[in-house]
A protein has these predicted regions:
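Helix-loop-helix module between adjacent transmembrane segments
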Residues: 69, 108-110
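Glycine/charged-rich beta-loop-alpha catalytic/anionic-binding loops adjacent to active sites
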Residues: 47-54, 96-108
Length: 250
């Protein structure tokens, strides 16, 4: 929808219990392989070759996201500017192995955009570790590409909402290349003592996978479904109305 009509969304980045709920740590290791760890899932995987690294298309796998992120960062032949006979040789040329540790303190399928924001966090950590000089907009764009690699698809609102702090209105123009403009909004309705206690983030325990929902919406778009297109247009207007209400302190 954003490609031919432009998109609008009001988004709020929050911490949970005073901590960033998604955290990623990257450090070098002496062995020329890649070690992936998940604190919340209690899982670990050691990657020693390109085939294992590019095995990232299993939806729900604990390490699909870091595998795809490393692939995009150039640690797989398809995205590398140089050719190497093996992953071990590439890591040796890089100077070390890599160890990535993930912590996701949000239930999977919560609807809070966890997967997209985690992907951006992993890409950001790899960017810092490897000195790739990506900015926030680059990271959000690469997150779109990463989700295509995972076959889950997705839009841009989740990662922009998490990577850029605070309350904001995100808007994009129609066109194949989506570069949303970030307009920050006042946060008094969420932080002022008179209003702060009016907001509650409550976990129902109900989960869902975005892939199926996205497939249904995209299919309806291709079929030019009137009801679906009408709802999407209403959602875009609703975002603008909501931003105006926040600006008015209403």
């Amino acid at each position: 929808y954003s490609l031919y009509s432009g998109g609008s969304v009001v988004n709020l980045a929050i911490e949970l219990n005073g901590q960033p709920p998604l955290q990623v740590y990257v450090k070098p290791c002496k062995e020329y392989h890649i070690t992936l760890r998940s604190i919340d899932m209690g899982a670990m995987e050691v990657i020693r070759n390109y085939e294992e690294l590019q095995d990232y298309k299993k939806v729900g796998s604990p390490f699909s996201i870091p595998k795809a992120a490393l692939t995009l960062a150039g640690f797989a032949p398809a995205f590398s500017t140089e050719s190497y006979p093996s992953l071990a040789k590439q890591l040796e040329d890089f100077g070390s192995g890599i160890e990535i540790t993930l912590l996701a303190a949000i239930p999977a399928g919560s609807g809070l955009g966890t997967s997209s924001i985690l992907a951006s966090t992993v890409l950001g950590a790899i960017n810092d570790f490897c000195g790739l000089a990506w900015d926030r907009n680059d990271i959000c764009s690469y997150t779109l590409a990463l989700e295509q690699l995972l076959t889950t698809g997705g839009g841009w609102h989740d990662q922009y909402g998490g990577v850029f702090p605070g309350v904001k209105l995100l808007q994009s123009e129609a066109g194949f290349e989506q570069n949303p403009l970030v307009r920050w909004l006042p946060d008094a309705l969420f932080t002022h003592p008179d209003y702060r206690d009016c907001h509650l983030l409550y976990y129902t325990g109900i989960t869902r996978t975005a892939k199926g929902i996205l497939a249904e919406i995209v299919s309806s778009m291709f079929l030019n479904s009137g009801p679906h297109l009408s709802l999407l247009a209403e959602m875009k207007v609703h975002a603008t109305d909501m931003s105006e209400a926040i600006l008015r302190g209403n």
